[in-house]
Amino acid sequence: MSDNMQPTDEVLDDEVLDEAEGADSFDEVEEFDPFEDMSDEELDALCDEDENLAGFGDVEPGFRSGFVALVGRPNAGKSTLLNACYGKKVAITSPVAQTTRRRMRAVVNRPGYQLVFVDTPGIHKPKDGLGSELNKSALFELNDVDVVAFLIDATKPIGRGDAWVAEHVKNARSKKVLVLTKADEADPAQVMEQLKAAHELMEYDDEIVTSSVKNFNVDAFIETVAHFLPEGPRWFPEDMGTDASDETLVAEFVREKVLRRTRDEIPHSVGVICDALEQTKKVLRVHATIYVEREGQKGIIIGKGGEMIKHIGIDARRDLERIFGTQVFLELDVKVKAGWRDDEAQIRRFGYNAED
């Protein structure tokens, strides 16, 4: 190793093991106390800092907090339920399957508890590298949360897709809550049939029937999952709504407008990156690039005389002005990146990869 190179963690681990193996016993390895030279005052300050890092603000005894993953097939209503729980739109929605590509966290505060809802991509049989990453992202959350809310559409017969999701959900260590969504679109007999079929897939710790668009049982759903949260600190500040960056919100809301305007023509080939975001005194200046895989798709998004891209920009700007609370100047470009959905580097560039 040259003098200018820093040793990696693996090299350091190997060196520590080599020293230990060279000694007659581990007793001969010199003990190291990182706090040995610290005064009592410095130790107290370190402890105070550690307590501040563990949570935000004082909480009363019995305060509950934790993470709730919303999982299910594509178009099961996960993002719509997340928005309903939060009270306003933070996750994009569209009739197109696999609209959600990024894990989105939304913080919901209530007296006595804090819930962090995690919206996940729909779990499905992947057809490309992007689909595989979306599945990994969703499945990663199952054992990393306190509660898994398994969403099943009340209007669609339960099939192999739901069964495949259930196989993963039932093996999770988390509590499981069955959530039957879109109840406003189903008759009572259909709801009862869906509940029966859902219980043939697996066992649940609780269940609830909801309609996010009608705000039916949304608060009851929040209370249901909060019951399973452990006692703990407030993980996020009370004034924090989502962990998504401004750049992520820009990219997602632009992509949503593309999906809604183009529908079935090019949905899965679209990726968006926010290239620049600058806040001036009176306006937020934003530049984003829409990527597709073929020249023909680029033409569809631009539209005749630029009409389609104009409407996409107007729609996105309205949402961004609502989110950021300021006037937005939005500039959009459209570029072709052939085969990006099977390119791991490009998937990471768009931010659609599962966490390492």
Model-derived regions: residue spans:
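P-loop NTP-binding site
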Residues: 248-356
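Conserved G1/Walker A P-loop phosphate-binding module
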Residues: 2-5, 9-14, 18-19, 24-147, ...
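Solvent-exposed alpha-helical segments within well-ordered globular domains of core cellular machineries
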Residues: 83, 102, 106, 136-143, ...
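Conserved glycine(s) of the Walker
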Residues: 77, 217, 308
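Canonical P-loop GTPase G-domain recognition
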Residues: 175, 184-246
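Conserved C-terminal guanine-recognition region of P-loop GTPase G domains, centered on the G4
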Residues: 108-114, 133-207, 261, 278-283
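Catalytic P-loop NTPase motifs of RecA-like helicase/translocase cores
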Residues: 100, 123-125, 157-158, 186-187, ...
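Conserved, well-folded catalytic cores of nucleic-acid-processing
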Residues: 88, 107-111, 141-148, 201-204, ...
